[in-house]
Amino acid sequence: MTDLAGGALEARIEYAARRKKEMNCCQAVLVAFADKLGKSEDELLRLGSGFGSGMGTMEGTCGALVGAIMVSSLLSPDGEARNNSRAIMSRFKELCGGATICRDLKGIGTGKVLCSCEDCVRNAVLAAGEAL
């Protein structure tokens, strides 16, 4: 568990950004909400392990965004997960230059980085926190 029980959103954002240095983007977002999810860090690390680097290929959805939607799905009241997912996706796109695919965010093919991994993690935690 994290030491963020009852912590402010800004503390979660900074915690996730620090933890990103040790794990993939999805995992960093998940562990920032471990206290709210009631899951151990080990469980969340395993859950998020396959979602780094755009699901392993940089071709898929950003792992940080996937992690934020996982958090929302687990914490949203019945019937609200879909709306919260839309809100998270919309806010993430707004904060990350309109992209949600890892390779686009990283500027693969264009040479223009829209959002660093650390900023994707920060933005995903922010979007999830705002939606919830």
Where on the chain are the PLM-derived regions?
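Short alpha-helical scaffolding segments that buttress acidic/His motifs in well-ordered protein cores
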Residues: 16, 29, 33, 47-52, ...
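Buried hydrophobic packing segments
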Residues: 29-33, 65-75, 124-128
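Glycine/serine-rich anion-binding loops at beta->alpha junctions
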Residues: 51-71
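Acidic-glycine-rich active-site phosphate/pyrophosphate-binding loop
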Residues: 2-5, 30-49, 95-102
